[in-house]
């Protein structure tokens, strides 16, 4: 008798979101009626999912091993170790699908993210409050930092080279404000802009959960960000977005075929694949240092893309 599977998911929330289409396909195609999903980094993205929510467990769930896992095949998912992924043949969502369903590269639907009325209202209310307070008609959500960002001795360091440079962040915010946009900064920590000479107040919401962030992005006029969670949320809620990539490949981490996603690839000419979760390659980290640094012309393109002038 074939045992049911327990799929273990780890990593950031963006990875968890990207696993959803493959898990939906597994439910449709496998005949495994009792499979479960075990999340090592939280279950928020699955809340309210019409078919997967009831199958999802935190890894600290009481008696999970005794009641479930002991009679199941445990599968640890790692899309970065899929050949098609590290050879730039597929997206992370497709890599999950190859791992889980073994059907090769195929089109997948966007992840199902069901937001509650309360979450939607919270997001809409925050956007409207920002518009009213800053006296602007349009709002951009800006996520400049990737998951690897660190704040060291007053400076921002991202060894994965996915985040915007701080000087460019300030310049972009200034120019968006000059175009009469209010800016909501999406960040896991507070950032000091006192010396940035910004024309308008910068909205920096605190203690906002990822589901409310999805709603904020939904009701904003545009999302601007790097290779991080926000771009995946924007894709899920069909928001117009501009995604700036550096050390990572758009085909792997973003949505180059989506009409409402604009990608500015800073690393197109110089980048090599960094084998994250496979091997440690300090040479590539050093090579990619500064890959996200922008000159004035590039910042102009970013602003034109966000404001719809390009």
PLM region descriptions:
Residues 49-61, 67-74, 195-207, 257-266:
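Active-site regions of enzymes building and remodeling cell-envelope glycoconjugates
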Residues 1-93, 215, 231-232:
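Active-site and donor-binding regions of nucleotide-sugar-utilizing enzymes
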Residues 4-6, 139, 222:
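Structural motif
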Residues 7, 36-37, 142, 185, ...:
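Structural beta-sheet core signal
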Residues 38, 58, 77, 186, ...:
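Generic beta-sheet signal
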Residues 78-87, 122-194, 247, 257:
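Active-site donor-nucleotide binding/catalytic segment of nucleotide-sugar enzymes
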């Amino acid at each position: 008798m074939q045992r049911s599977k327990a799929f273990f998911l780890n990593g950031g929330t963006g990875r968890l979101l990207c696993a959803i289409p493959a898990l939906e396909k597994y439910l449709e195609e496998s005949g495994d009626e009792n499979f479960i999903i075990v999340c090592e980094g939280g279950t928020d993205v699955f809340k309210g999912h019409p078919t997967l929510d009831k199958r999802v467990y935190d890894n600290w769930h009481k008696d999970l091993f005794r009641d479930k896992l002991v009679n199941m095949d445990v599968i640890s998912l790692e899309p970065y170790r899929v050949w098609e992924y590290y050879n730039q043949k597929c997206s992370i969502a497709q890599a999950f699908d190859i791992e889980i369903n073994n059907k090769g590269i195929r089109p997948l639907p966007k992840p199902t993210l069901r937001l509650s009325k309360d979450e939607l209202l919270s997001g809409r209310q925050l956007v409207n409050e920002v518009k009213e307070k800053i006296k602007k008609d349009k709002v951009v959500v800006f996520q400049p930092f990737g998951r690897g960002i660190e704040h060291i001795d007053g400076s921002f360091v991202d060894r994965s080279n996915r985040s915007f440079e701080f000087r460019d962040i300030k310049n972009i915010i200034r120019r968006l404000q000059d175009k009469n946009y209010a800016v909501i900064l999406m960040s896991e920590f507070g950032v000091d802009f006192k010396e940035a000479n910004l024309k308008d107040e910068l909205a920096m919401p605190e203690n906002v959960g990822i589901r409310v962030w999805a709603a904020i992005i939904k009701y904003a006029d545009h999302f601007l960000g790097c290779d991080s969670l926000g771009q995946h949320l924007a894709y899920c809620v069909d928001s117009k977005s501009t995604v700036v990539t550096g050390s990572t490949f758009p085909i792997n981490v973003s949505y180059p075929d989506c009409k409402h996603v604009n990608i500015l690839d800073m690393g197109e000419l110089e980048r090599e694949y960094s084998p994250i979760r496979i091997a440690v390659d300090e040479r590539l980290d050093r090579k990619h240092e500064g890959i996200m640094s922008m000159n004035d012309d590039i910042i102009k393109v970013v602003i034109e893309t966000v404001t719809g002038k390009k």
